[in-house]
């Protein structure tokens, strides 16, 4: 698999490409399947339909990897926090974490109840062309904890930060609990057919530098080390969003570092390019205009060159109203321009 080879710095005929949120509303096929499912959560839990939407961008865009269609919040859901996705508001937990008892009362063994995820991965792998990689994923303990404490997305993370500074032992207990579940969850995904796994730290930028490494990076490193220790042939990818100022402190046992669009690729390369394969980092909005998109591709490929050590991706997820024809052109351009 070209994608897996790139994760381990092996020679590839071109720079491989996949896109975060490549299965999504910019595809009419996705919207039709989503309607069929009835709700977003129902789509995540329906093996047949989740397989269908995972495969759609592989067939339409010809990307080099499929990423499991699911949501990072299925883990706290299976830990006993009722979850709903509200139109225009996003995910919301009807019960939240505010004290040690709430953490202790979380249901153990969530990874055992996520069989619909494992079944979906097995289904995808059986239908995916053998040369295409299958990526599994989870959210970071910190990012999941913020949702569990706030109850939904937040601009200030006030409750999470209040807990961090006033009662850090509660937050650390929650982070440790999540970390242990996520190790076993990713392991289950690998056993079900995932060829690589990615940890999304969507709310990394909410924390100042030293606090970030104590309350987020530490736990991601621990999960990555667990997976690499048991499955050295499986690439582990980390995507911490918005930590351009912290790159000099990045360390750990993982393979691929995802670069968000707010971080200059040249900066990431200067700090991390010899230690990790870099993934990214086209600004998704460039896909609104084909010429702007092509300029962005050229800039990134000029920095990264045609050398080993780069996987092309967006610096964040696909937007719902991006033109599908530009997404198709993006994959074609990257493949053509990066030919060895």
Swiss-Prot record:
<keyword id="KW-0627">Porphyrin biosynthesis</keyword>
<dbReference type="GO" id="GO:0005829">
    <property type="term" value="C:cytosol"/>
</dbReference>
<keyword id="KW-0456">Lyase</keyword>
<feature type="binding site">
    <location>
        <position position="147"/>
    </location>
    <ligand>
        <name>substrate</name>
    </ligand>
</feature>
<comment type="pathway">
    <text>Porphyrin-containing compound metabolism; protoporphyrin-IX biosynthesis; coproporphyrinogen-III from 5-aminolevulinate: step 4/4.</text>
</comment>
<dbReference type="InterPro" id="IPR000257">
    <property type="entry name" value="Uroporphyrinogen_deCOase"/>
</dbReference>
<dbReference type="InterPro" id="IPR038071">
    <property type="entry name" value="UROD/MetE-like_sf"/>
</dbReference>
<keyword id="KW-0210">Decarboxylase</keyword>
<feature type="binding site">
    <location>
        <position position="40"/>
    </location>
    <ligand>
        <name>substrate</name>
    </ligand>
</feature>
<feature type="binding site">
    <location>
        <position position="316"/>
    </location>
    <ligand>
        <name>substrate</name>
    </ligand>
</feature>
<dbReference type="GO" id="GO:0004853">
    <property type="term" value="F:uroporphyrinogen decarboxylase activity"/>
</dbReference>
<keyword id="KW-0963">Cytoplasm</keyword>
<protein>
    <recommendedName>
        <fullName>Uroporphyrinogen decarboxylase</fullName>
        <ecNumber>4.1.1.37</ecNumber>
    </recommendedName>
</protein>
<feature type="binding site">
    <location>
        <position position="202"/>
    </location>
    <ligand>
        <name>substrate</name>
    </ligand>
</feature>
<comment type="subunit">
    <text>Homodimer.</text>
</comment>
<feature type="site" description="Transition state stabilizer">
    <location>
        <position position="71"/>
    </location>
</feature>
<dbReference type="Pfam" id="PF01208">
    <property type="entry name" value="URO-D"/>
</dbReference>
<feature type="binding site">
    <location>
        <begin position="21"/>
        <end position="25"/>
    </location>
    <ligand>
        <name>substrate</name>
    </ligand>
</feature>
<feature type="binding site">
    <location>
        <position position="71"/>
    </location>
    <ligand>
        <name>substrate</name>
    </ligand>
</feature>
<dbReference type="InterPro" id="IPR006361">
    <property type="entry name" value="Uroporphyrinogen_deCO2ase_HemE"/>
</dbReference>
<dbReference type="GO" id="GO:0019353">
    <property type="term" value="P:protoporphyrinogen IX biosynthetic process from glutamate"/>
</dbReference>
<comment type="function">
    <text>Catalyzes the decarboxylation of four acetate groups of uroporphyrinogen-III to yield coproporphyrinogen-III.</text>
</comment>
<comment type="similarity">
    <text>Belongs to the uroporphyrinogen decarboxylase family.</text>
</comment>
